[in-house]
UniProtKB/Swiss-Prot annotation:
Provenance organism: Staurastrum punctulatum (Green alga)
Listed transmembrane segments: 17-37
Family designation: Belongs to the PsbL family.
Function in brief: One of the components of the core complex of photosystem II (PSII). PSII is a light-driven water:plastoquinone oxidoreductase that uses light energy to abstract electrons from H(2)O, generating O(2) and a proton gradient subsequently used for ATP formation. It consists of a core antenna complex that captures photons, and an electron transfer chain that converts photonic excitation into a charge separation. This subunit is found at the monomer-monomer interface and is required for correct PSII assembly and/or dimerization.
Record's bilayer topology term: Single-pass membrane protein
Protein's name in the database: Photosystem II reaction center protein L
Entry annotated with the keyword Kinase: no
C-alpha cells in the first residue's frame, strides 16, 4: 500500500485539516494562558 493513490487525497486532506485544528487549539490555549497569567 505504498503506491500513490489519487483516492487517498481525501484522507490526506482531512488529516491535514485535523493537524491545523490541533495547531489552532494549541495557539489559542497559549494565548489564553498568557492572557490569564498576566
Amino acid at each position: 500500500m505504498t503506491t500513490p493513490n489519487p483516492n487517498k487525497q481525501g484522507a490526506e486532506l482531512s488529516r491535514t485539516g485535523l493537524y491545523w485544528g490541533l495547531l489552532l487549539i494549541f495557539v489559542l490555549a497559549v494565548l489564553f494562558s498568557s492572557y490569564f497569567f498576566n
